[in-house]
């Protein structure tokens, strides 16, 4: 199985610094099991796999794997993947967009390509909103007014 890939050091300006990342370009027909084996072989914190987007309005579908499992989102893999894809466009003589939008398990991830004097130097992302779950106020209030022995010794907030 021949696949093109690139390794990159993210969050650094020197080789072998920062966070290493493997980016598998044109992941094609790789199965989840195959991606997992490849990620385990690289043994980096994360490895990304790039597929064509499902929606042509987006830049790519990106799947992120640790050596043990797939994850819905992670910061440095997105930054590194955007950097690699932008550099690939430059190498092919194609224009580099100001933004990429990756389709991921966590949702659409927008990234901005950073250029200095026409050279791709990095990328930055806006993380998707965190998923939170909070209890309704009535339930929280009930807990605070509980007759539990520990709570009964707490000073009243009123």
Per-range role (PLM):
Residues 1-17:
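N-terminal, positively charged, Ser/Thr/Ala/Gly-biased leader segments
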Residues 12, 51-54, 113-117:
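Short, low-complexity Ser/Thr-rich regulatory SLiMs
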Residues 37, 58, 65-143:
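Acidic, low-complexity central loop/insert segments
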Residues 44-61:
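Conserved phosphate-donor
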